[in-house]
């Protein structure tokens, strides 16, 4: 066992061992909400790295209703639900198995319905004390890069796992670097009724998650995650000096899209919060995977912005009016 493999979640190790010798021609990422958002970088990895395996990302219920014709015995379906009892995702696991697909579920609760429905389950850690490599993002990347290594002999597994192992230190430095900025953001946006987010490539899922989970779900602030590549095809008409934007710049191949959007926004906007992964210390991370790991750092930093905003607005991130409280 290599040093990198030894750092991989044991449940993921078991899955990867059983994956050897299997034929997979399609990977489906299936989840809802924030659990779906964390899968965007992994879809990006497959697009960039896989030579023979197609991949798609679906909201769980649409996965069932659309019923992709490619779904079958040569498919791998990766699912995620933090609670493990998201009804649509549990049903999606059963649906996929019914089609003969191989399924692995990620969850914080290994005894949950989703864990029982999938053939394999990988538990991740959660909370401020969780190490980066053991979080939902970290475990998902273990599955993704491990799958690429097993099925296609992809060479980035070692670099990705070592990078995940070093990522906690990157988090800690970035959080210190952004501490004052997060407080200033909270004070400046305390009374805002709408905040847009924008990114592209591997980073888009982070913008999407912050928009739908943090701002809309947890703070009841109107929001929309704008793809930087789509900005100049409609959305840029909304910007002026009164409209707040959070703009993310990553380290992947689509960074020029984000830079172009930022340049225009600086010209016509004023309330811009810019998080640039290039300003964080990635020196311990191999160059070949920096673009893939940057979204994880941006996500962690943005969480600190969310904590400060919730504190400033006296609106706890745990507060809900519909979710888990009414029938829906």
Curated annotation (Swiss-Prot):
Gene Ontology molecular function: carbohydrate derivative binding; glutamine-fructose-6-phosphate transaminase (isomerizing) activity; hydrolase activity
Gene Ontology terms: biological process: fructose 6-phosphate metabolic process; protein N-linked glycosylation; UDP-N-acetylglucosamine metabolic process
Name of the top EC class for this enzyme: hydrolase
Gene3D superfamilies linked: 1.10.10.2240, 3.40.50.12570, Glucose-6-phosphate isomerase like protein, domain 1 (3.40.50.10490)
Matches recorded under SUPFAM superfamilies: SIS domain
InterPro entries: FrlB_SIS (IPR035488), Fructosamine_deglycase_FrlB (IPR024713), GlmS/FrlB_SIS (IPR035490), SIS_dom (IPR001347), SIS_dom_sf (IPR046348)
Coiled coil: none
PROSITE patterns reported in the protein's UniProt record: SIS
Domain SIS: 15-153, 181-311
Keywords: Carbohydrate metabolism, Hydrolase, Repeat
Family matches, as Pfam families: SIS
EC number: 3.5.-.-
Role played: Catalyzes the conversion of a range of fructosamine 6-phosphates to glucose 6-phosphate and a free amino acid.
Subunit note: Homooctamer.
Protein name: Fructosamine deglycase FrlB
Species for this entry: Bacillus subtilis (strain 168)
């Amino acid at each position: 066992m290599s040093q990198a493999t030894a750092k991989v979640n044991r449940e993921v190790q078991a899955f990867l061992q059983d994956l050897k010798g299997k034929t997979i021609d399609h990977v489906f990422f299936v989840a809802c909400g924030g659990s779906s958002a964390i899968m965007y970088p992994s879809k990006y990895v497959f697009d960039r790295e896989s030579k023979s395996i197609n991949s798609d990302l679906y909201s769980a219920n649409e996965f069932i209703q659309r019923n992709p014709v490619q779904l079958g015995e040569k498919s791998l379906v990766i699912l995620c639900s933090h609670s493990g009892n998201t009804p649509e995702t549990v049903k999606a696991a059963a649906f996929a198995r019914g089609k003969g697909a191989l399924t692995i579920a990620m969850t914080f609760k290994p005894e949950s319905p989703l864990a029982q429905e999938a053939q394999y389950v990988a538990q991740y850690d959660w909370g401020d004390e969780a190490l980066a490599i053991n979080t939902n993002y970290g475990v998902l990347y273990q599955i993704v890069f491990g799958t690429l290594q097993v099925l296609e002999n992809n060479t980035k597994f070692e670099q990705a796992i070592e990078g995940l192992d070093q990522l906690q230190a990157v988090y800690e430095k970035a959080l210190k670097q952004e501490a004052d900025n997060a407080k200033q953001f909270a004070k400046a946006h305390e009374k805002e009724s709408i905040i847009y987010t924008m990114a592209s490539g591997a980073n888009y899922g982070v913008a999407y998650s912050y928009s739908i989970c943090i701002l809309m779900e947890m703070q009841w602030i109107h929001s929309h995650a704008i793809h930087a590549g789509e900005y100049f095809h409609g959305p840029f008409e909304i910007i002026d000096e009164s409209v707040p934007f959070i703009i993310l710049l990553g380290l992947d191949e689509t960074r020029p899209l984000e830079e172009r959007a930022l340049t225009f926004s600086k010209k016509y906007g004023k309330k811009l919060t810019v998080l640039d992964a290039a300003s964080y210390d990635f020196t311990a991370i191999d160059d070949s995977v920096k673009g893939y790991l940057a979204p994880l750092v941006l996500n962690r930093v943005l969480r600190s912005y969310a904590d400060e905003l919730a504190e400033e607005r006296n609106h706890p991130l745990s507060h809900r009016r519909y979710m888990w409280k009414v029938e829906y």
